[in-house]
Amino acid sequence: MTTNTPLPHAPAAARSSRGRAVALAAVFLIVTLAGLMYVKWWPYYHKAANAADTHSIGSSILGGASSESMSDIWRSAYNYSIAYFKSVWKAAVLGIIVSSMIQALLPANWLAKAFGKASARSTLIGGAAALPGMMCSCCAAPIAVGMRKRQASIGASLAFWIGNPTLNPATLVFMTFVLSWKFTVLRLVFGLILTFGISYLAERFADRGKLGDLPNRLAIPEEPANRAPLALRWLKSLALLFLGIAPIYAVSVFLAGCLQSFMLPAWASEGIVAIVLFAVIGTLFVIPTAAEIPIAQSLLSVGTGPAAALLLTLPGVSLPSLLIVSRSFPKRVLLFVTLSVMALGVLCGIAGSLWL
């Protein structure tokens, strides 16, 4: 009688596979932390020190058209797009690199274990993971796409995407120095509701029968047993991400830039009408990280309500970031998130008009 005995090299192969996964995860962590240090943490440290001394982080990025003619509106949108991309290009590149590394370097089951369950815990972990990133919604969007391709849950991916701009610790510090602690409290309270509450509720809007297909619409096909070299797989992931995101990003930023010419019409300069208007436009408009602070500061003459509405809606989501993630989340989920940002922006504006 013959018996099947395990191959002697099987345990060694398993250990080798685990060791390789740990090594690749270490590479991912080192590159990500180094990128954040260069793009975010070190510059923001100096920016916070300057804000403490001067109570300013610069002037508003908004320009607006000199007239209502279409040529001036297009020119204004073009100038805004150039200023915007000059401000965010490093973070945008970092976001795409991190997303590609998530897909090429990290084992899929690792993210599924940490972020894969449709639960409050998974949403909480996703939001907490966003805090060191300090990215704007557009720069965090590719990472959320990468998380979805690796089977992270809707709630966790949304919390990471939304939490990056709305709970940005550096922005909260800047806001305290430039505006006041009351603005910071409003932003923090409504930011927590948006990041964790809305992200968790959005999971309930998903069609469970279609969830399995969504992350794979732009996903890299599974590699066969004799997988391609790691560098080739990473470059493939990076190229597909760039080609899928860059055109949408550029065009949508230009279109969003057209909105700055309509930020303050004469017929909506105060009261609830102004708050609603700013909440809607702020949700669709796109800004670099922390740019909502000088924008709100420059609009305080209109009222604290509209300024408070913009402090939440401008960073929360934007038309470009919604388009970037549009194939990774169900449409009804993104519609719910968009309307929720607008509604919370109105509530934040009303609270600001009464308290600030």
Put a short name on every predicted segment.
Residues 130-188, 261-334:
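Membrane-interfacial helix-loop connectors
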Residues 1-29, 46-71, 207-237:
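Intrinsically disordered, low-complexity non-transmembrane regions of multi-pass membrane transporters
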Residues 68-70, 81, 85, 112-118, ...:
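Helix-boundary and loop/linker segments of multi-pass membrane transporters
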Residues 99, 103, 133, 194-199, ...:
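Alpha-helical transmembrane segments of multipass membrane proteins
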Residues 66, 78, 95, 101, ...:
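Transmembrane helical segments that form the transport core of multi-pass membrane transport proteins
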Residues 19-48, 113, 117, 122, ...:
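Juxtamembrane and boundary regions of transmembrane helices in multi-pass small-molecule transporters
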Residues 28-72, 94-106, 202-203, 252-263, ...:
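Structural signal for alpha-helical transmembrane segments and their membrane-water exit/capping regions
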Residues 74-99:
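Individual transmembrane alpha-helix segments
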